[in-house]
């Protein structure tokens, strides 16, 4: 499962929401489940998440994975997100607000969570042909900050160009899931949110990120980002010491 793909419509990537790290991870596992089912999902599909899968993918203890599933019963069901969409009759842009899931079923004895995505979520994670972002689950498996996970997604939506245009501060905060009274001082925002997130991304994912702050007068009004793909280490083929030199030379030729 570590090489499984997370695929989301860019509308969902750029949505505004506040999910705890465990909740983001459960959504990822459900998306992987939906993709690996091979036959698509609907708003009635029930997707199973096992504590063992959570523990294996995110390298956490059994207790931590059980806790993540138990807490989701109450917390994830109430979470919402919002995104912009076009009203087809007029072409006007409006705001869609939706829950993530319409149903949650938890079996404690089996350490099993069964979720059903809300109707608005289903088309944003399936049948995607354009305007979508994909990445390997293993890239975010070692991120321990909910902000780092969100920032990674926001960045790789721009993978082809390697940079993210300036994000106005309020919009950026909304996408990271910050409420109005959280880390209002810029020094706190950088210390608690931005810089730790970039540090984790640079250490644990496949990209290296830098940022630039933009000002209006003396006030920081937004941020832009540049990133590049890390070089993948080359795996050297190990020779069998029992292989005669004759065959080695033929192979190396």
Predicted regions, residues:
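Charged, alpha-helix-forming regions
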Residues: 1-253
């Amino acid at each position: 499962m570590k090489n499984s793909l997370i695929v989301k419509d860019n509308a969902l990537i750029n949505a505004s929401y506040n999910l705890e790290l465990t909740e983001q991870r459960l959504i990822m596992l459900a998306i992987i489940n939906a993709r690996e089912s091979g036959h698509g999902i609907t708003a009635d599909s029930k997707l199973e998440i096992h504590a063992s899968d959570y523990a294996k993918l995110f390298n956490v203890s059994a207790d931590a994975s059980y806790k993540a599933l138990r807490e989701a019963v109450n917390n994830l069901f109430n979470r919402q997100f919002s995104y912009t969409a076009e009203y087809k009759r007029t072409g006007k842009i409006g705001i869609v607000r939706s829950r993530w899931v319409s149903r949650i079923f938890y079996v404690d004895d089996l350490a099993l969570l069964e979720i059903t995505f809300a109707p608005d979520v289903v088309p944003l994670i399936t049948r995607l042909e354009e305007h979508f972002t994909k990445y390997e689950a293993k890239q975010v498996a070692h991120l321990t900050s909910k902000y780092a996970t969100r920032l990674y997604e926001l960045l790789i939506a721009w993978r082809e160009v390697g940079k993210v245009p300036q994000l106005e501060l309020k919009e950026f905060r909304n996408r990271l899931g910050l409420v109005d009274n959280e880390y209002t001082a810029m020094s706190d925002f950088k210390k608690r949110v931005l810089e730790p997130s970039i540090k984790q991304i640079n250490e644990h994912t496949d990209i290296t990120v830098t940022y630039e702050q933009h000002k209006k007068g003396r006030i920081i009004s937004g941020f832009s980002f540049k990133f590049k793909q890390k070089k993948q280490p080359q795996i050297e083929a190990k020779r069998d010491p029992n292989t005669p030199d004759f065959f080695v030379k033929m192979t190396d030729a």
